[in-house]
């Protein structure tokens, strides 16, 4: 099921594919609009697919937090980090950025401290100023 309730299934699918993943979900999802929850689901799915495809031997941490009027999504891996030149961003990352922007949020991607790759999204729960999906 797409949305926050479907995130554990995405994590389990990545685990079955051989990626050790830790999932941490904090806060209540009751305040999260359906479109925002779907965006979070898609970010996690795309980020885990990228880890499986590009990181080599790695582990991953998926952290979703709802609180303080925002939803944050963070996926960090311990893999080899980005191999593309910085000016070549994959279509998946572009799609993530566009969906987050629809809700007035920000997406940051890049090397993780200590190696690997990090995807971080911060999306306001208040839809004021957001563009309808």
Identify the role of each PLM range.
Residues 1-133:
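Glycine-rich ATP/GTP-binding catalytic cores of kinases/NTPases
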């Amino acid at each position: 099921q797409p949305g926050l309730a479907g995130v554990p299934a995405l994590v389990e699918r990545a685990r079955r594919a051989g990626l050790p993943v830790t999932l941490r979900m904090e806060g209540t999802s009751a305040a999260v609009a359906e479109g925002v929850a779907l965006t979070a689901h898609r970010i996690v799915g795309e980020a885990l697919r990228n880890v499986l495809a590009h990181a080599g031997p790695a582990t991953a941490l998926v952290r979703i937090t709802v609180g303080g009027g925002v939803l944050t999504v963070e996926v960090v891996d311990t893999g080899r980090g980005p191999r593309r030149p910085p000016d070549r961003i994959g279509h998946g990352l572009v799609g993530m950025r566009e969906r987050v922007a629809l809700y007035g949020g920000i997406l940051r991607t890049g090397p993780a401290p200590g190696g690997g790759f990090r995807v971080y999204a911060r999306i306001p729960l208040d839809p004021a100023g957001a563009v309808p999906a």
